[in-house]
């Protein structure tokens, strides 16, 4: 690990050498928080070539996370000095955006795409970044007389409701709801035109300010103190009126630009300007209602429709809306889309189906990740020509199922599980956008009590509940473990030795070698020791 750290320090020394002066166009593109240009990325990646150099940085990121001071400097360089705290976009066709730059960096490492680039997003990312909508809304409410004061986002009661952590309200604009595949295009050019207007507006304001200062100085030299006081008072009033009239006549994007410029934290790609202040909605029901009104259907989406619904997609009140929803989850990674989150919320909370997902074919969709079961059902419904209906889960739904369509989707971030064999579960291939190898390594380094490790263990444990004793933990070697951490440590240890072992359902009619809590601790320690031995062997 010392080798990795020393290599990164040398890398930073090279990166931070004085550069040749930038042209005006390059200087404009190098706004803090913006991605590197193609030329800048060539220079950046040249220092991470051959791949062992990139792998070295990835090992450090895997063990220390994105907050490691050395990695923070590296990430700052890749973002012109400021790591964005919202959603970012990439040049990967199958993983076009990520919820954070850290997630993007970890994805590059875990999937060995070391030279993937961060790019400017082709459309506003307000729907991708959980906090952006609140910040833009609060910026629009700043009084005109306090334009230059830092913007403070206001916490509202809705921020603590069950719709967290994604935005509580969705834009009724269909393009906002979908991802980049539904973009109508042209917004990048519009953003460029707006940026030019904003720069011109700022220059005009600076020139006006200089002229006003020169006039004040001349008046102070020519007139007596009493007359100066009167003129300064009159001039102050006139300037105040002029500034108010200028603000009122300016377009909204200019006002937002000036407001955001006073707060450095807003210089991130996630603050892409929306064409106008969006009309927000409480949930996906409002989208359906809006679509009905546009078609002059005038029938309210009310309890009578809900009580008649059996979960069939064909019974949704608006066909075009249904097509939009299906297109969104099929063209993108379903488990990551805001569409799936809103749709799931509507069915679970409003229609009352609850968390479990079953259909009329007797299948119980496997919850390998928070939205996996729901997306498995919806992909089947959207793609299948047969009538697939959602039903309340009961004893008749005995067939564990996960749609092959879900497994086939490219999981850019989030969790991914193999289709489980009957009565067996190998574990999550991906969790939080990171591979199982990463989590095994972190388990060995940080232990079971680490918050991130604990969440991973909990997610895996809850992903497989089968057998006569679903809360017990048994493996395919007929060993029963006192806790999931000891089981996972043993699985990581065997996997490192190229041996396979899976979790298996615990049955009453089977005999198992039951480990005591003390033996379980020994298993955990054994994996930690083996990993540390391997690490010391690699890095000296």
Curated annotation (Swiss-Prot):
Cell membrane as UniProt keyword: no
Chain segments carrying region Pro-ACR binding: 25-104, 316-424
Disulfide bonds, paired cysteine numbers: none
Sequence ranges of Polar residues compositional bias: 256-266
Compositional bias of kind Basic and acidic residues: 195-213
GO biological process, one term: fertilization
The keyword Phosphoprotein belongs to this UniProt entry's keyword annotation: yes
Region annotated Disordered, chain positions: 181-266
Compositional bias segments (type: Acidic residues): 214-241
Post-translational note: The N-terminus is blocked.
GO CC terms in record: acrosomal membrane; acrosomal vesicle; extracellular region
Highest taxon of source: Eukaryota
Keyword set, alphabetical order: Cytoplasmic vesicle, Phosphoprotein, Signal
Signal peptide: 1-24
Propiece span(s): 25-272
Biological role stated in the UniProt entry: Acrosomal protein that maintains proacrosin (pro-ACR) as an enzymatically inactive zymogen in the acrosome. Involved also in the acrosome formation.
PANTHER family, per the entry: ACROSIN-BINDING PROTEIN
Protein name as annotated: Acrosin-binding protein
Species of the source: Rattus norvegicus
GN (gene name): Acrbp
């Amino acid at each position: 690990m010392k080798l990795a750290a020393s290599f990164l320090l040398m890398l930073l020394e090279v990166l931070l050498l004085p550069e040749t002066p930038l042209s005006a166009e390059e200087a404009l593109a190098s706004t803090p928080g913006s991605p590197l240009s193609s030329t800048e990325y060539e220079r950046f990646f040249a220092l991470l070539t051959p791949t062992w150099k990139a792998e070295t940085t990835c090992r450090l990121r895997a063990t220390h996370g994105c907050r490691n001071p050395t990695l923070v400097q590296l990430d700052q360089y890749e973002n012109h000095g400021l790591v964005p705290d919202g959603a970012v976009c990439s040049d990967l066709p199958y993983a076009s955006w990520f919820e954070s730059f850290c997630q993007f960096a970890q994805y590059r490492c875990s999937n060995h795409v070391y030279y993937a680039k961060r790019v400017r997003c082709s459309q506003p990312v307000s729907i991708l970044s959980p906090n952006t909508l609140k910040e833009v809304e609060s910026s629009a409410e700043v009084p005109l007389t306090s334009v230059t004061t830092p913007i403070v986002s206001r916490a509202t009661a809705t921020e603590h409701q069950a719709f967290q952590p994604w935005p509580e309200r969705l834009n009724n604009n269909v393009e906002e709801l979908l991802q980049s595949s539904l973009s109508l295009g042209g917004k990048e050019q519009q953003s460029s035109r707006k940026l030019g207007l904003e720069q011109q507006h700022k220059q005009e304001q600076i020139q006006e300010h200089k002229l006003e200062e020169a006039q004040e100085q001349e008046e102070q030299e020519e007139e007596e103190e009493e007359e100066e006081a009167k003129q300064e008072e009159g001039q102050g009033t006139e300037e105040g009126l002029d500034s108010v009239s200028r603000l009122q006549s300016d377009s909204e994007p200019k006002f937002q630009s000036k407001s955001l410029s006073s707060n450095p934290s807003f210089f991130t790609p996630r603050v892409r300007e929306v064409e106008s202040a969006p009309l927000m909605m409480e949930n996906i029901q409002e989208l359906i209602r809006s679509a009905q009104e546009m078609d002059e259907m005038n029938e309210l989406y009310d309890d009578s429709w809900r009580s008649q619904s059996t979960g069939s997609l064909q019974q949704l009140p608006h066909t075009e809306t249904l097509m939009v929803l299906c297109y969104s989850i099929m063209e993108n990674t379903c488990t990551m889309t805001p569409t799936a989150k809103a749709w799931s919320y509507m069915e679970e909370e409003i229609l009352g189906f609850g968390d479990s997902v079953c259909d009329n074919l007797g299948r119980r969709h496997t919850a390998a990740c928070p939205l996996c079961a729901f997306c498995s059902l919806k992909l089947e419904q959207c793609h299948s020509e047969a009538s697939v209906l959602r039903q309340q889960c009961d004893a008749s739904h005995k067939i564990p199922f996960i749609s092959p369509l879900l497994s086939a989707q490219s999981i850019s971030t989030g969790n991914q599980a193999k289709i489980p064999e009957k009565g067996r579960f190998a574990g999550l291939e991906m969790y939080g956008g990171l591979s199982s190898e990463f989590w095994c390594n972190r388990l060995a380094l940080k232990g079971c009590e680490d918050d991130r490790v604990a969440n991973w263990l909990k997610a895996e444990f809850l992903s497989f509940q089968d057998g006569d004793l679903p809360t017990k933990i048994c493996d395919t070697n007929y060993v029963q473990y006192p806790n999931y951490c000891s089981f996972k440590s043993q699985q990581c240890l065997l996997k490192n030795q190229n041996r396979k072992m899976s979790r298996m359902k615990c049955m009453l009619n089977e005999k198992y070698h039951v480990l005591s809590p003390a033996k379980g601790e020994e298993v955990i320690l054994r994996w930690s020791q083996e990993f540390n031995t391997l690490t010391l062997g690699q890095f000296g």
